[in-house]
């Protein structure tokens, strides 16, 4: 009898065990689609990014014009650029929903998978930040100046560190060229980490909405979930195309239509929408070092979540108090995102401070208490 190549070939076997014959829980919902959507986002961003890099010039005197030239004179350059810029937004929408799913259903108890996921988020944030600087518009330049300047808050070595990162005494040509190099490199780092993420995931298998072991009821990934993933791909790519074709500048900052000018500061310096929650937390503390620590903590707190799990149930499906707390946290993050886009004045300052306090309070204090309380109420 002939050997089945798909199951025996050294390379095809890996693909088969990851995408075709993978045993998958029979009850995972649409919330489990976002992992594969993130994969599609990454592939799309790498392809469009490579095409853009072929026409981009990483020089302060040419960067802005090279992007304008791309949109005007390169075949479909405008489309490639719009897909790349809005693809980043879709990437962050998917990753935030993916993290929210993990948080709600207790997927963070697969500790290795979760920790690699948090590292992936940090790498994605770094990639998006350095990429935002490349068009060399006003907000690119001032965003880079403000955010890199935060490292100067580090005691003793801060100022040296910032000047080393800048390659001079301000954000200038050396900064732009190294940011381009980093922006080219990091997506491949993300791709590598994604493989590690999947390797750890396939050690334990996927979690499911009930948060219970599902080894007794597994189904093959293909055709059941492959077709479900293709539906997700279609919906996401249609959304991306719609955004890129009908309102490509909806999520961008109008300041970036003006070339970078170190002598004119924009009235409101703010990052892209996907960083606004962290920016609001940074601004809510009236001390530079304190703000930087809060900013770092707002994302690094994700590493602590597996350690703060007190409930004897994995998922929140049957935990109404935790569910209420979870949706309060989601609302709080939306409020922080809104506050981050507003000027620093009354009442936004106090709203931002309260929302920042609530964010840390819910994750560090209320979730563990409510988890323990639910154990008590359910006599677990």
Curated annotation (Swiss-Prot):
Please tell me the species this chain comes from: Paradisaea raggiana
Q: Which Gene Ontology terms describe the biological processes this protein takes part in? A: mitochondrial electron transport, ubiquinol to cytochrome c
Give the function comment from the record.
Answer: Component of the ubiquinol-cytochrome c reductase complex (complex III or cytochrome b-c1 complex) that is part of the mitochondrial respiratory chain. The b-c1 complex mediates electron transfer from ubiquinol to cytochrome c. Contributes to the generation of a proton gradient across the mitochondrial membrane that is then used for ATP synthesis.
**Cofactor: binding comment:** Binds 2 heme b groups non-covalently.
**UniProt subcellular location:** Mitochondrion inner membrane
Name the InterPro entries for this protein.
Answer: Cyt_b/b6_C, Cyt_b/b6_C_sf, Cyt_b/b6_N, Cytb/b6-like_sf, Cytochrome_b, Cytochrome_b_C_euk/bac, Cytochrome_b_N_euk/bac, Di-haem_cyt_TM
GO MF annotations, alphabetized: metal ion binding; ubiquinol-cytochrome-c reductase activity
One Gene Ontology term, aspect cellular component: respiratory chain complex III
Topological relation to the membrane, as annotated = Multi-pass membrane protein
Can the keyword Acetylation be found in this entry's annotation? no
Q: Which cofactor does it need?
A: heme b
Identify the gene encoding this protein.
MT-CYB
- What does the record give as the organism's lineage? Eukaryota, Metazoa, Chordata, Craniata, Vertebrata
What the entry lists under Gene3D superfamilies is as follows:
Cytochrome Bc1 Complex, Chain C (1.20.810.10)
Other information: Heme 1 (or BL or b562) is low-potential and absorbs at about 562 nm, and heme 2 (or BH or b566) is high-potential and absorbs at about 566 nm.
Q: Which domain of life is it from?
A: Eukaryota
Positions contributing to heme b b566 binding = 98, 197
**Entries under Pfam families matching the protein:** Cytochrom_B_C (PF00032), Cytochrome_B (PF00033)
> What keywords does the record list, in alphabetical order?
Electron transport, Heme, Iron, Membrane, Metal-binding, Mitochondrion, Mitochondrion inner membrane, Respiratory chain, Transmembrane, Transmembrane helix, Transport, Ubiquinone
Query: Principal localization?
Result: mitochondrion
Positions bound to heme b b562:
84, 183
Question: What PANTHER family has UniProt attached to this entry?
Answer: CYTOCHROME B (PTHR19271:SF16)
According to its UniProt record, which protein family does this protein belong to? Belongs to the cytochrome b family.
* Protein name, entry field: Cytochrome b
Q: How does it assemble?
A: The cytochrome bc1 complex contains 11 subunits: 3 respiratory subunits (MT-CYB, CYC1 and UQCRFS1), 2 core proteins (UQCRC1 and UQCRC2) and 6 low-molecular weight proteins (UQCRH/QCR6, UQCRB/QCR7, UQCRQ/QCR8, UQCR10/QCR9, UQCR11/QCR10 and a cleavage product of UQCRFS1). This cytochrome bc1 complex then forms a dimer.
Q: Which residues bind a ubiquinone?
A: 202
Transmembrane residue ranges: 34-54, 78-99, 114-134, 179-199, 227-247, 289-309, 321-341, 348-368
């Amino acid at each position: 009898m002939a050997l089945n190549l798909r199951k025996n070939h050294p390379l095809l076997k890996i693909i088969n065990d990851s995408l075709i014959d993978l045993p998958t829980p029979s009850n995972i919902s649409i919330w489990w689609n976002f992992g594969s959507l993130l994969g599609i986002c990454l592939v799309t961003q790498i392809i469009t990014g490579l095409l853009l890099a072929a026409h981009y010039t990483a020089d302060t005197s040419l960067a802005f014009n090279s992007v304008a030239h791309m949109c005007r004179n390169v075949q479909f350059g405008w489309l490639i650029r719009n897909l790349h810029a809005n693809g980043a937004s879709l990437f962050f929408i998917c990753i935030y929903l993916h993290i929210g799913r993990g948080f709600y259903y207790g997927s963070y108890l697969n500790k290795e998978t979760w920790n690699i996921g948090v590292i992936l988020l940090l790498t994605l944030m770094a990639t998006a930040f350095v990429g935002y600087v490349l068009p060399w518009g006003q907000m690119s330049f001032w965003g880079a100046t403000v955010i890199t300047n935060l490292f100067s808050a580090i005691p003793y070595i801060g100022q040296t560190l910032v000047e080393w990162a800048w390659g001079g005494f301000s954000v200038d040509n050396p900064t732009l060229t190294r940011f381009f190099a980093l922006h080219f490199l990091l997506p491949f780092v993300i791709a590598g980490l994604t493989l590690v993420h999947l390797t750890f995931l396939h050690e334990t298998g996927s979690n499911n909405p009930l948060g219970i072991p599902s080894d007794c009821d597994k189904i093959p990934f293909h055709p059941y979930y492959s077709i479900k993933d293709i539906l997700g791909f279609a919906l996401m790519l249609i959304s991306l195309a719609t955004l890129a074709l009908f309102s490509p500048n909806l999520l961008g900052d109008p300041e970036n239509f003006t070339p970078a000018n170190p002598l004119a500061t924009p009235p409101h310096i703010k990052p892209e929408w996907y960083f606004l929650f962290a920016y609001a937390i940074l601004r809510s503390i009236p001390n530079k070092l304190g703000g930087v620590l809060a900013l770092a903590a707002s994302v690094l707190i994700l590493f602590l979540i597996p350690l703060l799990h007190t409930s004897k149930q994995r998922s929140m499906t049957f935990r109404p108090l935790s569910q209420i707390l979870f949706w309060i946290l989601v609302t709080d993050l939306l409020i922080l995102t809104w506050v981050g886009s507003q000027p620093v004045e009354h009442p936004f300052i106090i709203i931002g401070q309260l929302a920042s306090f609530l964010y840390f309070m819910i994750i560090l204090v209320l979730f563990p208490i409510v988890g323990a309380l639910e154990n008590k109420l359910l006599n677990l």
